[in-house]
């Protein structure tokens, strides 16, 4: 411990930190104990050390137990409605991926089989739950997670984001801990938007389509990426972080509008001549049923290059959500919209009552807009706007009733007032 003394204007003694030896004039705060002192900088350092040790011990205690595919699927059920087959495919793929990492951490013998990485492609209509599935998986496994938008990516040297910026975002999520980032999950959204216009090789330079697919190949398969620590474009004077992407799980997702037609064209192809099998053009299948017949060759025909499709061996297709599924999404998940709005109104000392016909009307509106589950919140916000504007200023509102006529815009939500004598009700006047 440091034992410095000197002259001070007040008491003739200059105080020093017993740990780092800095004087009271060199630090912002000096805390006194029995015959010792500690400065604010040393307190911060101690807090950081304790925090790191707690995180390490937590990781070690939970790291041994990897949830089984069935447990993963059951957890996904709490947040995502329907999509049973997609959940099963995801659960098995993610379980095998992290089981592979556990094997990789142990010492390998000469005869050990090397397990390859299986990245995932999610194909489904907009608002069917692709992003939510990936987010829930990352939260369940307690690994770093980031979402990248494929439409903003360009080849290196062109205006736009380099593909390495995806890894830089992942590093940001885990405070630039490279080891942690190397076991994370990256979700690349709108992957269908980087498809080339035809399945023939492009003659002209396609810097945001086929060029991006080429740039993503090595990153997805596994390479040591040089990432600028503060993001942005690379320059020679900058030091880079080296991140091995070989153990990062890449999940790519896209709506692939028109892919069902590509699948139908392939499956309905017949021979020629009298013995050719004649197939009906209208089989009555919906988009979800058609997507289940997806083959890698359909993705190539759609505009993904064969090498890119080969890097995504696990394909999970999601069904289009029907009205019943949308109603269930509104009220069943842990973070459902009904529960969220109930909590918001509860904070104002009142409750909100969504009638069943109201939820069906919301689901019906979302289906008409073809926005899937993503459009549910905007409908609810629009319907409850006036009510949420007035409630904080009103007194004694104990209940808000929302029925089908409110969703259709025919009437306003009913406010129930609690008085000492009885309860009275009136509609919210429109602005």
Swiss-Prot record:
Taxonomic classification: Bacteria, Pseudomonadati, Pseudomonadota, Gammaproteobacteria, Cellvibrionales
Stated name of the protein: ATP-dependent Clp protease ATP-binding subunit ClpX
Oligomer and partners: Component of the ClpX-ClpP complex. Forms a hexameric ring that, in the presence of ATP, binds to fourteen ClpP subunits assembled into a disk-like structure with a central cavity, resembling the structure of eukaryotic proteasomes.
CDD domains (alphabetical): RecA-like_ClpX (cd19497)
GO-annotated molecular function: ATP binding; ATP hydrolysis activity; ATP-dependent protein folding chaperone; protein dimerization activity; unfolded protein binding; zinc ion binding
HAMAP family to which the protein is assigned, alphabetical: ClpX (MF_00175)
PROSITE patterns: CLPX_ZB (PS51902)
Functional description taken from the UniProt entry: ATP-dependent specificity component of the Clp protease. It directs the protease to specific substrates. Can perform chaperone functions in the absence of ClpP.
Assigned protein family: Belongs to the ClpX chaperone family.
SMART domains on file: AAA, ClpB_D2-small, zf-C4_ClpX
Signal peptide: none
Residues that, per the record, bind ATP: 125-132
GO cellular component annotations of the record: HslUV protease complex
All residue ranges annotated as the ClpX-type ZB domain in the record: 5-58
InterPro entries assigned to the protein according to its UniProt record, in alphabetical order: AAA+_ATPase (IPR003593), ATP-dep_Clp_protease_ClpX (IPR050052), ATPase_AAA_core (IPR003959), Clp_ATPase_C (IPR019489), Clp_protease_ATP-bd_su_ClpX (IPR004487), ClpX_bact (IPR046425), P-loop_NTPase (IPR027417), Znf_CppX_C4 (IPR010603)
Keyword set, alphabetical order: ATP-binding, Chaperone, Metal-binding, Nucleotide-binding, Zinc
A Gene Ontology BP annotation from the UniProt entry: proteolysis involved in protein catabolic process
Alphabetized Gene3D superfamilies for the sequence: 1.10.8.60, ClpX chaperone, C4-type zinc finger domain (6.20.220.10), P-loop containing nucleotide triphosphate hydrolases (3.40.50.300)
Binding residues for Zn(2+): 17, 20, 39, 42
């Amino acid at each position: 411990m440091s034992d410095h003394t000197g002259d001070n204007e007040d008491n003739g003694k200059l105080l020093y930190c017993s740990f780092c030896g800095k004087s009271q004039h060199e630090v912002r705060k000096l805390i006194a104990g029995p015959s010792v002192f500690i400065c604010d900088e040393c307190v911060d350092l101690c807090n950081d050390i304790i925090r790191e040790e707690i995180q390490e011990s937590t990781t070690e205690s939970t790291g041994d137990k990897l949830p089984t595919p069935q447990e993963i699927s059951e957890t996904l059920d709490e947040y995502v409605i329907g999509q049973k087959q997609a959940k099963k495919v995801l659960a098995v793929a993610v379980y095998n991926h992290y089981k592979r990492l556990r094997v990789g951490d142990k010492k390998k013998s000469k005869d050990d089989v090397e397990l390859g990485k299986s990245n995932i492609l999610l194909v489904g209509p907009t608002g069917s739950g692709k992003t939510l599935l990936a987010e829930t998986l990352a939260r369940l496994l307690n690994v770093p997670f980031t979402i990248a938008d494929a439409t903003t990516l360009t080849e290196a040297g062109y205006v736009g984001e380099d593909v390495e910026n995806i890894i830089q975002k992942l590093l940001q999520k885990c405070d630039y801990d490279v080891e942690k980032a190397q076991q994370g999950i990256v979700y690349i959204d709108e992957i269908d938007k980087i498809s080339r216009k035809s399945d023939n090789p492009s003659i002209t330079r396609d810097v945001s389509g086929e060029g991006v697919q080429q740039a993503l190949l090595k990153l997805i398969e596994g390479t040591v990426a040089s990432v600028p620590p503060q993001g942005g474009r690379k320059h020679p004077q900058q030091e880079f972080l080296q991140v091995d992407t070989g153990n990062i799980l890449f999940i790519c997702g896209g709506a692939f509008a028109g892919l069902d037609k590509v699948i139908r064209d392939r499956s309905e192809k017949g021979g020629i001549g009298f013995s050719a099998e004649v197939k009906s053009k209208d089989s009555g299948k919906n988009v979800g049923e058609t997507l289940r017949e997806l083959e890698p060759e359909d993705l190539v025909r759609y505009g993904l290059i064969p090498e890119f499709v080969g890097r995504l061996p696990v394909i999970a297709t999601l069904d289009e959500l029907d009205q019943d599924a949308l109603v269930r999404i509104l009220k069943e998940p842990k973070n459902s919209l009904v529960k969220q709005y109930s909590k918001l109104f509860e904070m104002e000392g009142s409750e909100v009552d969504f009638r069943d016909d109201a939820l069906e009307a919301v689901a019906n509106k979302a289906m008409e807009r073809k926005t899937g589950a993503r459009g549910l919140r905007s409908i609810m916000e629009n319907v409850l706007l006036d009510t949420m504007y007035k409630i904080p200023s009103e007194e004694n509102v104990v209940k808000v009733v929302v029925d089908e006529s409110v969703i259709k815009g025919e009437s306003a939500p009913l406010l129930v007032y609690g008085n000492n004598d009885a309860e009275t009700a009136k509609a919210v006047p429109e602005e």
